[in-house]
Design a protein with these regions (language model features):
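Active-site helical microenvironments for divalent-metal-assisted chemistry
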Residues: 1-177
């Protein structure tokens, strides 16, 4: 994902690249990030330890990197509601408020969508992901092409083409329903 940001998006700001490398760490391994190997992650309450994980990132890589990681970290969604709708609302808010975070979220989104055909989960799970991502493709395109998105024009062209492929992949898996 970080290599796509550098090679294809044309973005080389160090704090953005660092945040791209760390983008899932607060969601996936907050306990290990905050406390090392002392406690297995499955025994740690992720929400409780996210602030400590973000502080570790700030201490090691700087506040600007930690802020970007915090921005792209998905919140805990209300499981009693529609988590896909909550995810889409979160992404739109994030993309609207944080132009630098768009760079990371766009790369992650493209990676997730284009990678559907490499996903080893059961077909039903892949279809759920396709239905989660597909409604956001045009929104992602709008934010990618926005003037305040800190990506050079050639990077925006790459994103535009990649979102076309992402849409095709999502449509394919949705059509298998």
């Amino acid at each position: 994902m970080a290599s796509r940001i550098i090679k294809h998006f044309g973005v080389t700001e160090p704090h953005i690249i660092r945040a791209a490398l760390l983008h899932d760490s607060v969601e996936d391994v907050p306990g290990r990030l905050a406390y090392g190997l002392m406690v297995p992650d499955e025994e740690i309450d992720d929400l409780k330890h996210r602030p400590a994980a973000l502080q570790t990132i700030a201490d090691m890589f700087g506040e600007d990197t930690a802020e970007l990681v915090a921005n792209v970290t998905n919140p805990e969604f209300d499981r009693s509601g529609d988590t896909q709708v909550q995810y889409r609302e979160h992404v739109v808010e994030l993309m609207h408020e944080h132009p630098e975070a768009r760079v990371i979220k766009l790369s992650d989104f493209i990676d997730n969508c284009k990678g559907l055909n490499h996903n080893e989960r059961p077909l039903a799970a892949i279809q759920r992901l396709a239905r989660k991502y597909y409604p956001l493709i045009e929104t992602m395109r709008e934010f990618a092409l926005a003037e305040d998105t800190p990506i050079p024009e050639q990077g925006k062209a790459y994103i535009n083409e990649s979102l076309d492929v992402a849409g095709e992949r999502c449509e394919y898996y949705i059509s298998l329903s």
